Amino acid sequence: MISRKSFDDQIKIVHNITYLSGSDEAGRGCLAGPLVVASVILKPDYFNPLIKDSKKLNPKTRQVLYDEIIKNCLDYQIIIISSKQVDELNPLQASLLGFKTTINNLKITPDLALIDGNQNIELTNIKTLQIIKGDDKSFSIACSSILAKVTRDKILDEYDQIYPNYDFKSHKGYCTKKHLLAIQKYGILDIHRKSYKPIKKISKETS
């Protein structure tokens, strides 16, 4: 298997381009908290073999790499989409909004935007390429996944201080047994996604 950096470099050669961006999201499947999307254009000579899918890294390593990526990119953009917005748009449309916004807001217009996943995204004057399991294949996407994950985890850690009974620090808003039990016991919060089936079910049971 070729390295993530080689994957990106080959794409640059094949497409004869200079600026390549990578985009990924964090928190799309969560029951609580925002959806976070990040896009990044890295310096061409930057590489760190430790960088991979953010979910495969421990929190301390992710934070160190987050700081390193910020220092070694030409530009990056992060958008935080609230749980209310996710409910209003639906998770897919919220993700698409995040990808479009962060890519369009980059100070340097990428010649090609690599996006994690298989959903077709069309941008005006910017070519896009969807990469399934992109955070495992592309260095740029892996870097964007770290930016998104670290940003989102910090928000959930803050929620943990505000709502200590829900243990957001451990499950980060995902649908775990402990999280569901806390919702049943202490109630549905404003930061919960009311359109998600587990939340709908608890809402019906407690109404």
From Swiss-Prot:
Cofactor binding remark? Manganese or magnesium. Binds 1 divalent metal ion per monomer in the absence of substrate. May bind a second metal ion after substrate binding.
Explain the purpose of this protein.
Answer: Endonuclease that specifically degrades the RNA of RNA-DNA hybrids.
Q: Recite the UniProt keywords alphabetically.
A: Cytoplasm, Endonuclease, Hydrolase, Manganese, Metal-binding, Nuclease
GO molecular function annotation: manganese ion binding; RNA binding; RNA-DNA hybrid ribonuclease activity
One GO BP on record is: DNA replication, removal of RNA primer
Q: Where does a divalent metal cation bind?
A: D24, E25, D116
Name the reaction it catalyses: Endonucleolytic cleavage to 5'-phosphomonoester
E.C. number:
3.1.26.4
Protein's UniProt name:
Ribonuclease HII
Residue intervals of the RNase H type-2 domain? 18-207
Subcellular locations according to the entry: Cytoplasm
Gene name, Swiss-Prot/TrEMBL: rnhB
Entry-linked InterPro entries = RNase_HII, RNase_HII/HIII, RNase_HII/HIII_dom, RNaseH-like_sf, RNaseH_sf
Main localization is: cytoplasm
Cofactor(s) recorded in Swiss-Prot or TrEMBL = Mn(2+); Mg(2+)
